[in-house]
Amino acid sequence: MRQIAFYGKGGIGKSTTSQNTLAAMANRHGQRIMIVGCDPKADSTRLILNAKAQTTVLHVAAERGAVEDVELDEVLKPGFGGIKCVESGGPEPGVGCAGRGIITAINFLEEEGAYTDLDFVSYDVLGDVVCGGFAMPIRENKAQEIYIVCSGEMMAMYAANNIARGVLKYAHAGGVRLGGLICNSRKVDRETELIENLAARLNTQMIHFVPRDNVVQRAEIRRMTVEQYAPEDNQAQEYDQLAQKIINNEKLTIPTPLEMDELEELLIEFGLLGDEEDRQKQIAAQDAAIKATAAK
């Protein structure tokens, strides 16, 4: 059994990318998969279950009074392609630590024997947060392969670099490795070249470039993956290619995160960030505009 995790900046399309890819892995390649959603939004399994947010382990545990009183079939639901789906959940906003929900859920699943008869367990983890709780799949050596969903946008690349730092921190203590960057395209100029360059500097690969296509949104509105909604579409073939690459991936590395100066140099090189001279010109132009407005 292989345990993988998808990380990435909030809003990058991580849950969408992971569910579409896992659907292809299960439906086309017969992989037995369990998804463990590690995001308090509980949206990591929606497209697989064709449903609204799934009832979470923490929610049921709160109703029962203790996680020991939860039955496995209350929180583990089968979905498209026979994929088993679980959402860890989290506390009310502003109260407690959502990371504890992940720890509680994983321990519960292990004790209930949910990890048997599987080829893959996939953890879908909140945004770019690599604090203790959200890093739990990495820290406790649960997830052995980390896939970072990113794009050619500046903040997505910052997040990818930060996540690589988190992987590096635990790589020597455990067996966690970086499996690659998945570029979920935002149609940025020279995006493929940029992410390939970033991947090389991080000592990894751009495992796949997922083009932008409106069929993904059309499927999402129906709470489906593209694999279920339009299996003959070109986009379904893209997710299938990514699925095959993950199944066959042997390039698992210890990342070499960039220093901030190095990352900024890369962004400047590709025109995503101006150099110091450009920055000073921007500031001067803004100051002039403010003064002109004030003088009216």
UniProtKB/Swiss-Prot annotation:
Keyword check for Nucleotide-binding, yes or no.
yes
Query: Where, in this chain's numbering, is [4Fe-4S] cluster bound?
Result: C97, C131
The EC code for this enzyme is: 1.18.6.1
Which PROSITE patterns does the record match to this protein?
Answer: NIFH_FRXC_1, NIFH_FRXC_2, NIFH_FRXC_3
Q: Which UniProt keywords apply?
A: 4Fe-4S, ADP-ribosylation, ATP-binding, Iron, Iron-sulfur, Metal-binding, Nitrogen fixation, Nucleotide-binding, Oxidoreductase
Q: Where does ATP bind?
A: G8, K9, G10, G11, I12, G13, K14, S15
UniProt keyword ATP-binding present = yes
Kindly state which reaction or reactions the protein catalyses.
Answer: N2 + 8 reduced [2Fe-2S]-[ferredoxin] + 16 ATP + 16 H2O = H2 + 8 oxidized [2Fe-2S]-[ferredoxin] + 2 NH4(+) + 16 ADP + 16 phosphate + 6 H(+)
**Catalytic class of the enzyme:** oxidoreductase
Q: Which cofactors, if any, are listed as required? A: [4Fe-4S] cluster
Describe how it is modified after translation: The reversible ADP-ribosylation of Arg-100 inactivates the nitrogenase reductase and regulates nitrogenase activity.
Modified residue ADP-ribosylarginine is at which positions?
R100
- Report which superkingdom the organism of origin falls in: Bacteria
Instruction: Please provide, alphabetically and separated by semicolons, the GO molecular function terms listed in this UniProt record.
Output: 4 iron, 4 sulfur cluster binding; ATP binding; metal ion binding; nitrogenase activity
| Biological process terms in GO annotation | nitrogen fixation
Q: How is the cofactor bound?
A: Binds 1 [4Fe-4S] cluster per dimer.
* HAMAP family per record: NifH
**What does the function comment of this entry state?**
The key enzymatic reactions in nitrogen fixation are catalyzed by the nitrogenase complex, which has 2 components: the iron protein and the molybdenum-iron protein.
Quaternary state and interactors: Homodimer.
The UniProt entry, under PANTHER family, shows:
LIGHT-INDEPENDENT PROTOCHLOROPHYLLIDE REDUCTASE IRON-SULFUR ATP-BINDING PROTEIN (PTHR42864:SF2)
What NCBIfam families does the database record attribute to this sequence?
nifH
Family, similarity comment:
Belongs to the NifH/BchL/ChlL family.
Q: What is this protein called?
A: Nitrogenase iron protein
Q: Which organism is it from?
A: Trichodesmium erythraeum (strain IMS101)
